[in-house]
Amino acid sequence: MTLTVTFWGTRGSVPAPGASTAYFGGNTPCVELRTGTNALLILDAGTGIRHLGYSLLERAGGKPIVADILLSHAHWDHIQGIPYFTPLFAAGHEFTFRGAPALLGGIEYALRAQMTAAVFPVTFDAFRAQVHFRALNEVERGDGYALKTTPLRHPGGATGYRITDGNSGAPALVYISDNELGNAEGYSSAPGWRDELVQFVRGASLLVHDAQYTADEYERHRGWGHSRYEDVVDLAIDAGVQRLVLFHHHPERSDIALSEQLAACQKRVSEKGARLEVLAAAEGTTLTV
């Protein structure tokens, strides 16, 4: 099975529009995933989902759009695009919000709360599409795909996803949006948490991972739930990943600075003698897995 991955939002924390971020993009996280059976999964719903909505309507040509929206967690940058996701306001479409059982209640609350009268002109109930909420099992199967989840190290909790062909188990996309690979003392993780994460990621064709901080930035933001890019490269190497995509870019990182960060990651791979392709997520980019 082929998985097709399109990046609609790549920035972390807050939108960062402007000339200096035009290449890699300023919208917050949203990734479109199409399976070999053309099932549609939407990973997170930051501001990038607004343009995805327009694209889906154009491609659908009046036919119903059906999708699962997998939300890693309910922090603003991962849900703030929902009120501007045009297909939700049209009858005939169907969307199911998915989240880990421990997080789903908070996700539904946050989605509704960001559309209350004090902060938005219409409520969540203004949607005309069919809307559902359904918890994700740790392991489950969908239309031609299999999905596994893992808890991430992020304040309030977050969820990572491994998506594969439903029959062969390959190829594998692993999506880990908000995850702190350092600061072991700051989380109640089991002693072998990193080994377990390596096994979850093991052999992925494509790993999309939060790489928000440089080493200096990280020291000022320990406990904020994001990773140094060096730690992300090391995880990908240890797990035998084929391609690593740096994601959840720092909102103040310019295209020039992000290109330098990417080059530093590629240099680290070379110095370790590893075989790993490293990319930086850019809005509008489509990758085939």
Predicted features by range, described:
Residues 177:
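Conserved beta-strand-loop-short alpha-helix elements that form
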Residues 172, 180-277, 282:
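Cap/insert and terminal regions of metallo-dependent hydrolase folds
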Residues 1-174, 182-187, 198, 255-289:
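Binuclear metal-dependent hydrolase catalytic cores
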